[in-house]
Amino acid sequence: MKPTKQILEDILDEVRPLIGQGKVADYIPALACVPNDKLGIAVFTNDGEMLTAGDATECFSIQSISKALSLTLAMELYQPEELWQRVGKEPSGQAFNSLIQLEMEQGVPRNPFINAGAIVISDMLYSRFSAPKHRLLEFVRKLSGNDHIIYDRVVANSEMDHSDRNASIAYLMRSFGNFDNEVMPVLKNYFHACALSMNCVDLARTFGYLANKGIQPGISEPIVTPMQCKQINALMATCGLYDGAGEFAYRVGMPGKSGVGGGIIAIVPGEMTIAVWSPELDPSGNSLAGTKALELLSERIGRSIF
């Protein structure tokens, strides 16, 4: 079955009672004030159709969803052996901002989608781009077709003001020789990436290339090769939802990437991308109602990579 607007609306009605059972991220003060009752979904098909329901056009901070975009840029710039000697490809099984595993493994992060891995990727982008945050913003605007996407400066500044743990991660990696630049300028770019302000429609369209073998609908030149597209989707399927990746694979069965702003992007290779948003999180830091919405959609339309 193909998704329809009615299916999306019915699913949001079913998951709405979950609102109040999760917790909005409060360790970043600018995120703590987001209303907890927001709920939206957008589906973008490979033939260019966009379906929406709920608060799909309201912007929010995409947070760690941006890590998949930063990885995409890094894969364009670096040879595989350069990239993967600095960051791994395995699930961590730890909290996304954990230092314990990082020290045990000599400063090499488990994967690009935990904080340590994304900070290494930011360090690599900083080495190649004169203005990394502007390059990322240009990239997102190109993919989404929306020139009005911006960084939320309030969120970025809030993260910078509460950056001690991420700075500790960066300095620990630097002590092991896995960090090339000054820490704070790299972190500033990292926080700006997390502070991208987008909505479900923007996100669903932006990630279209991952559902289409690296080709973005409406853009002639490939964004990544088919092999790179497969690799990014594989990492999203195994590592994209922190230490809840296995639960997400079991319930939803799609490559995905979440953020503590309450957004999740999910990929149905060869067919569509799906973006959901609900700010309240489960204990793993993933959207509680958003995950349930994706689970129901997977069941209703009969889509899964498994």
UniProtKB/Swiss-Prot annotation:
**Protein's UniProt keywords contain Hydrolase:** yes
Question: Where along the chain is substrate bound?
Answer: S64, N115, E159, N166, Y190, Y242, V260
- Please give the SUPFAM superfamilies that the UniProt record associates with this protein: beta-lactamase/transpeptidase-like
Keywords assigned by UniProt, alphabetized: Hydrolase
Gene3D superfamilies named in the record = DD-peptidase/beta-lactamase superfamily
GO:BP terms for this protein?
A: glutamate biosynthetic process; glutamine catabolic process
Catalysed reaction per UniProt? L-glutamine + H2O = L-glutamate + NH4(+)
The terms under GO molecular function for this entry are: glutaminase activity
What general EC class does the enzyme of this chain belong to?
A: hydrolase
The answer to keyword ATP-binding applying to this record is no
The EC code for this enzyme is 3.5.1.2
Q: Which residues constitute the signal peptide according to the record?
A: none
Assembly, per entry: Homotetramer.
Q: Which family, according to UniProt?
A: Belongs to the glutaminase family.
Protein name (record): Glutaminase
Organism the protein comes from: Aliivibrio fischeri (strain ATCC 700601 / ES114)
